[in-house]
């Protein structure tokens, strides 16, 4: 009977430690992101589009945030296919990431009122993106470092 009692106490102890350790597990929900956050756009080049046109849109996109005093980075990438250790020479897709310093800054930006000039400037770079690319993927991202 004493052995059964000790086994029961041991089982309760291990269960308690297991429950408490799970309680302190870090959350990886987007709303708990502690690093920089971003909007990721993956695009395909239109037949009539050019990398030069895409780069022009990226430049205006960056200027849009800078002109409004925001510390936001617009990063653009050209993706290339890989075949084993070799990289193909032709662009595969284009990627744009709009990086905000924090979730709080992104939220403040998203909840602000757009002026007529804001909308005009926004439409200007979006039109250039749309003339050169088609967005196929939209994601929100959290940088862990």
Question: Residues of each region from the PLM?
Answer:
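Thioredoxin-like thiol-disulfide oxidoreductase module
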Residues: 78-84
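An amphipathic, aromatic/His-enriched active-site/gating alpha helix that lines ligand/cofactor pockets
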Residues: 23-29, 64-75, 86-93, 97-142
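N-terminal prepro-regions of secreted/extracellular proteins
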Residues: 8, 29-30
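Alpha-helical segments in soluble extracytoplasmic regions
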Residues: 54, 58-65
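Sec/Tat signal peptide C-region and signal peptidase I cleavage site
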Residues: 17-21
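Sec-dependent N-terminal signal peptides
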Residues: 4-15
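Acidic/histidine-rich, surface-exposed loop or edge segments in extracytoplasmic proteins
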Residues: 33-45, 107
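Short, surface-exposed ligand-recognition loops at beta-strand->loop->(often short) alpha-helix junctions
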Residues: 46-55
């Amino acid at each position: 009977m004493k052995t059964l009692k000790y086994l029961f106490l041991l089982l309760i102890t291990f269960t308690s430690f297991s429950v408490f350790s799970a309680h302190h597990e870090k959350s990886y929900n987007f709303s708990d992101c502690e690093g920089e956050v971003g909007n990721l756009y993956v695009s395909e080049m239109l037949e009539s589009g050019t990398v030069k046109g895409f780069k022009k849109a990226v430049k205006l996109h960056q200027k849009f945030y800078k002109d409004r005093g925001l510390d936001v980075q617009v990063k653009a990438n050209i993706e290339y296919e890989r075949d084993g250790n070799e990289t193909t020479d032709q662009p595969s897709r284009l990627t744009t990431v709009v990086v905000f310093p924090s979730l709080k800054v992104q939220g403040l930006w998203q909840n602000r009122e757009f002026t007529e000039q804001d909308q005009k400037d926004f439409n200007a770079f979006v039109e250039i993106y749309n003339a050169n690319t088609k967005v196929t993927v939209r994601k929100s991202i959290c940088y862990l470092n």
